[in-house]
């Protein structure tokens, strides 16, 4: 059950495995793992696979990021930082280093929790968290309280140390030492991953509750509308007569809400990537890719400036479901019903270039 992946400077693919998830907890008795895949002879096929680290503490880690010999693993409630000191691709506690980089993220064994770390062109680290919320402190001593009506966190609606009130899911950045954290966007339902381009633009995708999944442009500092601004109410409590579900869920008629972007209905968006070079050919430069396992597809976009944001026109970049029929995500049994093989042929968790 690969949950997230990253590719290092040597072309090795690092993958987190999420076997011990919820009712399957304990299935892998030694814990979940981070695995390294290699093509050692350059023929384009994986011929080597080894476990970098396996720990009982790892339970469905939803993110991995690799920077030279430093590996960040997102495993709620912690971001764990491993340093492979001898660079042998195997974590040895007698030689290598392990530290809890940041902590305080809600909720273990939940997909609306801590997601993957990724880098920005500014040299900072970025990560997202779902609407389970978080109360975490950076290494500068600043505490951020981001709660909501999903888990009814006691700190919902409380000010963070920077003086702002943040609710719902969020995107944050921090410097490589863990200092000077910032909240860049908030009030998502459950943004699995985001990306920051070399021009500084940010994009993300967001799980829905009813059929209103979206891929969006992140305008820094903005609210994406899921909870009320004090975090006390979910969107249904404030739905106005005549509003569609996407308009109400993402509060598109409320002042201060960020434009929802491409709202495409039911699904379960996960990994996202942006192509900036010609690795996939010249036509792929500027291509935004977003995984949608619920619809058996990796969506593609070429973001085009429009007003203060971007126009996002969706197309199928890679799919096994050419008719576009939505057969259901895991929460409605889509992954467990084998009567139609379309549901199990292609359920992409992540995409990297």
Model-based region annotation:
Residues 1-353:
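Beta-propeller domains with acidic blade repeats across secreted/periplasmic ectodomains
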């Amino acid at each position: 059950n690969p949950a997230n992946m990253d590719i290092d400077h040597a072309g090795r693919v690092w993958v987190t495995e999420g076997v011990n998830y919820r009712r399957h907890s304990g299935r892998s008795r030694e814990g979940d793992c981070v695995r390294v895949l290699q093509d050692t002879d350059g023929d384009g096929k994986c011929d080597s696979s080894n476990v970098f680290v396996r720990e009982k503490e790892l339970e469905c880690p939803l993110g991995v990021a690799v920077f030279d010999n430093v590996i960040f693993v997102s495993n709620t409630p912690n971001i764990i930082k491993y340093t492979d000191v001898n660079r042998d691709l195997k974590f040895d506690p007698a030689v290598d280093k392990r530290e809890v980089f940041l902590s305080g993220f809600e909720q273990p064994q939940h997909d609306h929790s801590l997601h993957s770390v990724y880098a920005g062109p500014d040299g900072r680290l970025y990560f997202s968290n779902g609407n389970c919320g978080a109360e975490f402190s950076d290494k500068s001593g600043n505490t951020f309280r981001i709660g909501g009506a999903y888990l009814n966190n006691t700190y919902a609606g409380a000010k963070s140390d920077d003086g702002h009130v943040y609710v719902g899911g969020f995107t944050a950045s921090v410097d490589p030492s863990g200092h000077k954290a910032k909240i860049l966007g908030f009030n998502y339902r459950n943004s699995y991953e985001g990306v920051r381009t070399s021009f500084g633009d940010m994009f993300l995708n967001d799980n829905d509750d009813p059929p209103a999944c979206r891929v969006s442009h992140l305008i820094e500092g903005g609210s994406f509308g899921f909870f009320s601004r004090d975090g006390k109410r979910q969107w249904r409590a404030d739905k106005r007569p005549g509003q569609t579900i996407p308009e109400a869920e993402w509060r598109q008629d409320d002042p201060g809400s960020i434009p929802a972007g491409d709202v495409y209905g039911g699904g379960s968006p996960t990994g996202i990537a942006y192509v900036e070079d010609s690795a996939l050919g010249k036509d792929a430069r500027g291509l935004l890719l977003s995984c949608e396992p619920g619809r058996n597809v990796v969506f593609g976009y070429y973001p085009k400036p429009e007003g203060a944001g971007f126009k996002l026109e969706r197309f199928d970049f890679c799919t096994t479901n050419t008719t576009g029929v939505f057969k259901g995500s895991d929460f409605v049994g889509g992954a467990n019903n084998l009567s139609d093989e379309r549901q199990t042929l292609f359920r992409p968790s992540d995409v990297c270039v």
